[in-house]
A protein has these predicted regions:
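Short intrinsically disordered terminal tails
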Residues: 1-4, 67-70, 129-132
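Residue-level marker of intrinsically disordered, low-complexity segments enriched
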Residues: 3, 7, 18, 33, ...
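Amphipathic alpha-helical interaction modules
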Residues: 22-88
Length: 132
């Protein structure tokens, strides 16, 4: 059964990676419309890009774990560490945004970091749901 979990995760990561590629493709197709549109569209595009980049990094990290650890027990141990780190990072980013005092100088970076973390967190939650 452990092998089937790893196999399921690998297949799910391939599907998620395809979703990331589609998301990036959609962003590229809409680039001209966004750049010529209102600032709110640029902001939305930037947050979407950060979110997708976070998803891609989480997928890449999980694929690396699958390649590095052949034993399911070792993989799950390191996966749980990764998932915990990403969850904690997401909580930290939300807290950081809520406590932002110097909005003009740090707002863009804080929002980008938050959406990057949210993208990673989405992947972890999705993988956790199929492992249950």
């Amino acid at each position: 059964m452990s092998e089937s979990i790893r196999y399921t995760i690998q297949n799910e990561l391939l599907d998620l990676y395809d979703d990331v590629k589609v998301g990036l493709s959609d962003l590229n197709e809409q680039k001209a419309l966004t750049i010529n549109g209102p600032a709110s569209k640029l902001f939305k595009r930037a947050t979407r890009m950060s979110y997708i980049q976070g998803q891609k990094q989480a997928i890449d990290e999980m694929n690396q774990l699958l390649e590095t650890y052949d034993e399911d027990e070792q993989f799950l141990e390191h996966y749980n560490q990764l998932a915990s780190r990403i969850r904690n990072d997401n909580i930290e980013k939300v807290f950081s945004l809520s406590n932002l005092t110097d909005i003009p100088s740090h707002f863009e970076e804080t929002i980008a970091d938050l959406y990057f973390s949210k993208g990673q967190n989405f992947i972890i939650k999705h993988i956790n749901s199929i492992m249950e």
